[in-house]
Amino acid sequence: MNRGYALQYDEQIISYGIKYVLQVIKTLVIAIAIGSVTQKIMNTGIYVYFFIKLRKKCGGYHAPTQEICCTLFGIFLFITILGDGIFLDVHKIIIIVSAFVVYLKLSYEVPCGTIQNPIPNGVKVIMAKELKHYCQIGIFLLGGVSILNIDMGYFAACGVIVCGVLFG
């Protein structure tokens, strides 16, 4: 009897793993598609790099559904890659306002674990400090490169802020 339960539990774990891998592939396909359509593959690579590195190190915000998560990823990727010289003044305002509003909101919610992978309280404190550190660096970089009007530096700062603040 226990053996049947163990097999069913293993099937659930395998099913969850397959769904997770498919979600990651879907997210990467969206990133590649947006990068291809906008002809900003390098910018997309920088964004995805920041996203993965910061998400792994700082935890993150989890949207209520996978569709919302994927949509948010795509929207903020699109906003971020537009920071490389296109609509720069409007983009600066969008990023600065978004960064501060979302940073304030998520300061109380990030990092959060999942049912499958809860984060112990001691680790949450460390991850929250890491997130704040990345956000402070991003905001400092954004301010500096905005004043100096450095497009690629501005884009990198946007990547740090958008990934660090929105996805922790």
Please describe what each predicted stretch is:
Residues 1-43:
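Hydrophobic transmembrane alpha-helices
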Residues 51-62, 109-114:
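C-terminal ends of transmembrane helices
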Residues 89-104, 158-159:
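Alpha-helical transmembrane segments
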Residues 64-75, 92-98, 123-125:
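Cytoplasmic-side transmembrane-helix entry/capping segments in multi-pass membrane proteins
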Residues 56-72, 78-83:
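Interfacial aromatic-anchored transmembrane helix boundaries in multi-pass membrane proteins
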Residues 112-138:
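Membrane-helix boundary/juxtamembrane motif in polytopic membrane proteins
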Residues 143-168:
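Alpha-helical transmembrane segments and their cytosolic interface
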Residues 80-92, 133-152:
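Hydrophobic alpha-helical transmembrane segments in multi-pass integral membrane proteins
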